[in-house]
């Protein structure tokens, strides 16, 4: 089964999204990856974000980011 891919930028992890990565990694239905740079420096500077199946998902806080990731997945099922 193909799992949704959640990608994090290491620079954004240092800015606070590390907690979101750790929460999402606990979900066995997700593939969570960490990369050196995803090339979204402007968005990265603004606050917590992740790529969800290639689409930018942001949150004002870590909790909001996690909720927005799950909301995005609910609204955009893979199958």
Curated annotation (Swiss-Prot):
<comment type="similarity">
    <text>Belongs to the UPF0349 family.</text>
</comment>
<protein>
    <recommendedName>
        <fullName>UPF0349 protein BCG9842_B0165</fullName>
    </recommendedName>
</protein>
<dbReference type="Pfam" id="PF07293">
    <property type="entry name" value="DUF1450"/>
</dbReference>
<dbReference type="InterPro" id="IPR022916">
    <property type="entry name" value="UPF0349"/>
</dbReference>
<dbReference type="InterPro" id="IPR009910">
    <property type="entry name" value="DUF1450"/>
</dbReference>
